Amino acid sequence: MRFRKTNPGDLPQLKSLWALGFGDTEQEIEAFFAISYPTATGFCAEEDGKVIAAAYALPQEVAWGEKNCRTAYLYAVTTHPDFRKRGICAKLLAYAEKELTKRYFDCLTLVPATDALRSYYASLGFVSQNTAFFDEGGAPEARGVCEALSPTEYAGLRETVLYDAPHARYSLADLRYQASMSGFYRLE
């Protein structure tokens, strides 16, 4: 088994692994690879020519007022189901950390989707910081105007609102990817 950076020739295998690991639609998978993948650094574990695990480092900043640090947001970390429980993901993330440190990233960030994943990443040395939870149900009835925003407009509004709070500053490519899934809106 070897660990390496991904390349364009890996795309068919990476997309298949993504579908298997997350169950996303073809449209969602294609959106990531068309919009975010070109600015990301992909890492994979390969065995006998087959990609069996992958993770993508999206360059970001963690900002707080005038202060910021470079972070690599580890996104879509997955291992083929036939190869889980063998320590492959831990080794892949260690390889990614080593490579990203060479590129002068100050830290790595993750957003685990479940408590089980949070515990798993904690076992690898990741620590939780100011966790936010979202409740998509029970929102009050909309009042006023709902205005669609471009990714650039959303980025400006987000920076204005979060300026004095620690927050991730997303790249325009990542915001375009998010917008392709749901869009950005301002309520007035």
Where are the regions a protein language model picked out?
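Conserved functional hotspot residues or short segments at active or partner-binding sites
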Residues: A116
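Conserved acetyl-CoA-binding loop-helix of GNAT-fold acetyltransferases
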Residues: A76-T79, K85-K98
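Conserved GNAT acetyl-CoA-binding A-motif
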Residues: L93, L100-A113
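A conserved beta-strand-loop-helix scaffold within acyl/acetyltransferase catalytic domains
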Residues: F3-V77, D164-E188
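Conserved residues at beta->alpha junctions
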Residues: K5, P112, A148
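Amide-forming acyltransferase catalytic core, primarily the GNAT-like/NAT-type
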Residues: L124-E188
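Thiolate-centered catalytic microenvironments shared by cysteine-dependent enzyme domains
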Residues: S119
